[in-house]
Structure formats: structure tokens, C-alpha cells
UniProtKB/Swiss-Prot annotation:
Modified how: Methylated by PrmB.
Signal sequence interval, chain numbering: none
PROSITE patterns the UniProt entry points to: RIBOSOMAL_L3
Name of this chain's protein: Large ribosomal subunit protein uL3
Protein family according to the UniProt entry: Belongs to the universal ribosomal protein uL3 family.
Gene transcribed to yield this protein: rplC
GO CC entries: cytosolic large ribosomal subunit
Lineage: Bacteria, Pseudomonadati, Pseudomonadota, Alphaproteobacteria, Hyphomicrobiales
Length: 240
């Protein structure tokens, strides 16, 4: 089981095939997605990699987090997430995952936070049909109607579909096909829509209901930081 990645949704566009057909795609960007920590069976009871993405200002990072980034020798990150892996696919700390971690044609599962739409009625939130236009109905054409029984059961059951807040929920979309990858710019183009708004964080994993292509690199595609690179600002802040 390989590690997933954290990506930032940039928006949607389309790409054309050789036959002239266009494919709607969502553009996901890997902005310095690095391994910042490990979870091991001996210490934590499970095996996982902790990834970070983005560039956070040192003043906005807590002292404990600055120390964590200093140990990993990476700059402070905006977003952190864990991905369960096997012992054989545990990536080294400091490794930066590149866009060709996923191969063209493979299927991925994406997870994000859906767009918030505020308070919504039952017709928009649950696709209710609404009440009749005439025949005694007035004012309440878009209402949800009855919510329960009479004296028995004498209550409205929990989880009844009613008006309320719509969106801002964790949503996973399965089996989206990778159309293109751009290693230099760190872009992954997946076919179809991805949950969330532009600028939101998206978790991308190998599809659990599809076979992993033989071309997919194991344990993953990444590049290591330069041995002679200068220490990150987080190191100085942690020591101070």
C-alpha cells in the first residue's frame, strides 16, 4: 500500500485527445509535498507517513511544530496529513513526492471538503419534490411536508431529512482517472470534478477498488533534499 499525497485544487479546465475529443479535468498542484514524520509499529502501533505541504510563516507555527520540522530538516508546512502505508513503502523523511507518483491512466480516490452553501431548504439539500403548485397549497410550495406520525410515535425521529446547513463536509470521490502529470510544475490532472473550492486541500490516494498499474513506482516517486542545503528557518527558530 503506497502513500497518498496532499494537493491543492487550482480549478477545472479541459484537455483534448488526438481524436479531438475534450476531457474535463481538475488541476491539482503539489506544492512541496514532503515527508515530515513516520509512525511505526513499535512506537505508535501502526505504520504511516506524515506529509506536509505549502509554506507557512515561522511566526504562525507553534514551538512544538517548529521543533518537529527542525528534526525533519524541512521548512514549516501549512497542511499536515497522515497516510497509512506498509513497511516496504515507507518513504524517507525529507523526501518530496513528485507528480509522477501517479501514472497516466491509473485511477485515484480523492477526498476534500465540499463547498459550503449555507442554510438550504429540503428541495435543494435532499432533492425533495416539494408540494403541489395549487389544490390548496399556498406559501409552502417548497416545504418538506410532514416530519412524523401522530400520537404514535409522538415524535420526529433523529436524522430526518429536513432543511439545514448544506456543504462543508468531508467527501470522497472514487475512481477518478489520471489524465496528465507535469513534474516540473507539480501538476496532476484528473478527469471529472473534485470536492471543494479552488484553493482547498485535497487528499489523493491510489484507488482502493482498482488494481494498481504495473507502471506505478514503488515505494513511490520522490526526490531527496540536497545534502548540502542550508537548514530551514524552522531550525533556527526551534533552537531559539
Amino acid at each position: 500500500m503506497r502513500s497518498g499525497v496532499i494537493a491543492q485544487k487550482l480549478g477545472m479546465t479541459r484537455v483534448f485527445t488526438d481524436a479531438g475529443e475534450h476531457i474535463p479535468v481538475t488541476v491539482l498542484k503539489l506544492d512541496g509535498c514532503q515527508v515530515v514524520g513516520h509512525r511505526t509499529k513499535e512506537q505508535n502501533g501502526y505504520v504511516a507517513v506524515q506529509l506536509g505541504i505549502g509554506r507557512a510563516k515561522v511566526k504562525n507555527v507553534s514551538k512544538a511544530e517548529r521543533g518537529r520540522f527542525a528534526v525533519a530538516k524541512v521548512e514549516p508546512k501549512l497542511k499536515l496529513a497522515e497516510f497509512r502505508v506498509d513497511d516496504a513503502t515507507l518513504l524517507p523523511i525529507g523526501a518530496e513526492i513528485t507528480a509522477d507518483h501517479f501514472v497516466v491512466g491509473q485511477f485515484v480516490d480523492v477526498t476534500g471538503t465540499s463547498t459550503g452553501k449555507g442554510f438550504a431548504g429540503a428541495m435543494k439539500r435532499w432533492n425533495f419534490g416539494g408540494l403541489r403548485a395549487t389544490h390548496g397549497v399556498s406559501i409552502s410550495h417548497r416545504s418538506h411536508g410532514s416530519t412524523g406520525g401522530r400520537q404514535d410515535p409522538g415524535k420526529t425521529f433523529k436524522n430526518k431529512k429536513m432543511a439545514g446547513h448544506l456543504g462543508t463536509e468531508r467527501v470522497t470521490t472514487l475512481n477518478l482517472r489520471v489524465v496528465q502529470t507535469d513534474v516540473e510544475r507539480g501538476l496532476i490532472l484528473v478527469e471529472g470534478a473534485v470536492p471543494g473550492t479552488a484553493g482547498g486541500w485535497i487528499y489523493v490516494r491510489d484507488a482502493v477498488k482498482k488494481h494498481l498499474p504495473k507502471e506505478a513506482p514503488l515505494p513511490g516517486k520522490f526526490r531527496l533534499a540536497n545534502e548540502g542545503a542550508e537548514p530551514a528557518p524552522a531550525t533556527e527558530s526551534a533552537e531559539g
